[in-house]
Each structure stands twice: as C-alpha cells, then as structure tokens.
C-alpha cells in the first residue's frame, strides 16, 4: 500500500479546504484507509499499489506523510 494524492480519470487530485471531505473522497472513491487535506489537495493513506497518484516532490510527500502522523 502507498500514500499520495489519488487522481481521477482526468489526472487531477481533488482540491479541498476541509479534511472530512478528503476522508470521504479517499475512502469511498479511491478505497484508501483514510485521507485528509494537505496543501489544498486530498492526500490519501493506504492506497492500493496500482492506484495512480500525482507525481510530487519528496519534500511535499514527506510533509504530508509527517503531518498525518503527528
């Protein structure tokens, strides 16, 4: 399993302001374990390995991974 910004068929990650929106989006639409709003896009945790995710910098990934843990 992996973490990241899950993308839809048009290659876009859902934009957000609220974390509960992302949790629903990540769990119900992308079947992840959970999700939250990180830097204005929905960041999902526990995505299946074959899910497409947005290419992001390591710095941004570390930031989003770190924020949910703490």
Swiss-Prot record:
* Cellular compartment(s): Secreted
Cysteine disulfide links: 16-37, 22-42, 26-44, 38-64
Chain ranges of the LCN-type CS-alpha/beta domain? 2-65
Short name of any one Pfam family annotated for the protein: Toxin_3
Q: Which InterPro entries match?
A: LCN-type_CS_alpha_beta_dom (IPR044062), Scorpion_toxin-like (IPR003614), Scorpion_toxin-like_sf (IPR036574), Scorpion_toxinL/defensin (IPR002061)
A biological process from GO: defense response
Recorded GO cellular component terms are:
extracellular region
Please give the chief subcellular localization of this protein.
secreted
Q: In which tissues is it expressed?
A: Expressed by the venom gland.
Q: What remark about domains does the record contain? A: Has the structural arrangement of an alpha-helix connected to antiparallel beta-sheets by disulfide bonds (CS-alpha/beta).
* Family statement: Belongs to the long (4 C-C) scorpion toxin superfamily. Sodium channel inhibitor family. Beta subfamily.
Role, per record: Excitatory insect beta-toxins induce a spastic paralysis. They bind voltage-independently at site-4 of sodium channels (Nav) and shift the voltage of activation toward more negative potentials thereby affecting sodium channel activation and promoting spontaneous and repetitive firing.
Protein name per UniProt: Beta-toxin Isom1
Q: What species was this sequence derived from?
A: Isometrus vittatus
